[in-house]
Every structure is written in structure tokens, then in C-alpha cells.
């Protein structure tokens, strides 16, 4: 696949901010974001929202970082280092979501923002309360350049069970109505097909309202961190000035390669791997 341009040695690279939780198993969250961002040649900045206790078998618990500390991390990065894009992952609580939204507005940020609405872990462990879900929809989605839920998160966010193309389109439109510029409904959890089709919707003002991104399904049980990896790659492409459809297309190709190179780890789901050779 074609990669993003690498910065010349000794020059300052583009900067992308990940606002997410830390995964003690190293498969998802901040750790997955930093791996993809680093391999793609951008400087990864972070604002940690939670410290999780997890491994390949699941999430055993987490410690929420105080909202004011999350906000201060974002401010510290933006006011000194500067960013060309950002992404969110696990935000843990309504107070953290509010702090992220308020800080974004206070700093008058206009850089692209990818919102990966992490509501539950891949093992089904809940990561957001109902109140936090409301904050996510009401406060953060309207600031997002693109939101990137999987099918389980779509069900929690807009109450639609995606079972086919028609319901996937309905879900994308319902998500878009919550305020983001674009809504991406990932089809990776729709196991009834040997294809993985993601659907991007940008509304009537986007010209071509729907964009489909289709790829052969990669058969692997080592898929931990796939959603984080996709969103991180999209953020990197947006930092380079890609349009949202082009950035999502790049992210889809990237995560497909990462799934193909995923490796076993522990006794559960191993991580996707961005460490394949760049040829």
C-alpha cells in the first residue's frame, strides 16, 4: 500500500493528539494509537483519560483520570507543541467528555477531530455510563470531523441493529444527524459476510453522500485494538491534509494490513500489528 510521506530527518514532523485510555496489555488505547502514529511518521502526543487494568482476556477495571487533569494535558500540548489533528478513544465519564469538549472550544481548535466512541471493550466490558453516552452525543459529536463507531457502539448510540446495507445506511444517517461532519459505520463486526464493508456518510452537502470501503475479511482472532488503529490512521491522514473520504480509505487499507500481520499474545485476543515492513 502507499504510505504517508515521512518527514525529512531532523525536521519537525506533524503532530497528532490521542485523547484516550492506557491499556496495560499494550494492545489498544493510547499504546495502539502511538504505534500507528509513530510508524506513519507523525509525532504522537497524548492526553490520558483512564488507566485500565486489562490483558488479552478482558478489562478487570480502570482508574479514571480527573477531568481537570485531562483538560490540562490537552492545553499543555496544544499551546506549546501544536497539533494538526486529534482523535479520542475511551473517555471514561461524562465529566471527562465535557472537559474535552469545553477545552476544544476554549482553545478555538479547528484541526480535524476523529471521535472513536468507545462505549465497551471488545470483550463486552462496559466503559461508559448512560449519562456519559448522552454527553458523547450532545457535546462531542457536534465537534467531530468524523465519528467511527463499530456496530455494537452504533446500537448503543442510535438504537439501530445493523444487519445489512439498508440498516447500515440508516445508522450512518442517524449518527450524522447528531452533528459530526461525517459518520463512518464500520462493518467489521458483521460476521455474516466474508467481506468487511465500512460505510461513510457526509450528508447532502458532501456531494457524494455515501462512500463504501470494502475489503476481504481477515480471518483472525487477534484483532485487539483494531478500532483504535483505524481511527489513529485516519487522524494521521487528516493531519496530512487528506479529505475525509480519502483519509478513511487510507485508514481502511492500513487496518486491513495490520489485521493480516496480527500476532498471538497471552491467552486471549492478540493485537493488530502496524509493524509490518514498509515496502
Curated annotation (Swiss-Prot):
Function: Catalyzes the phosphorylation of hydroxymethylpyrimidine phosphate (HMP-P) to HMP-PP, and of HMP to HMP-P.
Any Gene Ontology CC annotation: cytosol
Class in the EC hierarchy, top level: transferase
Residue numbers binding 4-amino-5-hydroxymethyl-2-methylpyrimidine: 54
Annotated keywords: ATP-binding, Kinase, Nucleotide-binding, Thiamine biosynthesis, Transferase
Superkingdom: Bacteria
Molecular function in Gene Ontology: ATP binding; hydroxymethylpyrimidine kinase activity; phosphomethylpyrimidine kinase activity
Pfam families, sorted: Phos_pyr_kin
UniProt family annotation: Belongs to the ThiD family.
Catalytic activity: 4-amino-5-hydroxymethyl-2-methylpyrimidine + ATP = 4-amino-2-methyl-5-(phosphooxymethyl)pyrimidine + ADP + H(+); 4-amino-2-methyl-5-(phosphooxymethyl)pyrimidine + ATP = 4-amino-2-methyl-5-(diphosphooxymethyl)pyrimidine + ADP
Protein name, UniProt field: Hydroxymethylpyrimidine/phosphomethylpyrimidine kinase
GO biological process, one term: thiamine diphosphate biosynthetic process
Record organism: Mycobacterium leprae (strain TN)
EC number: 2.7.1.49, 2.7.4.7
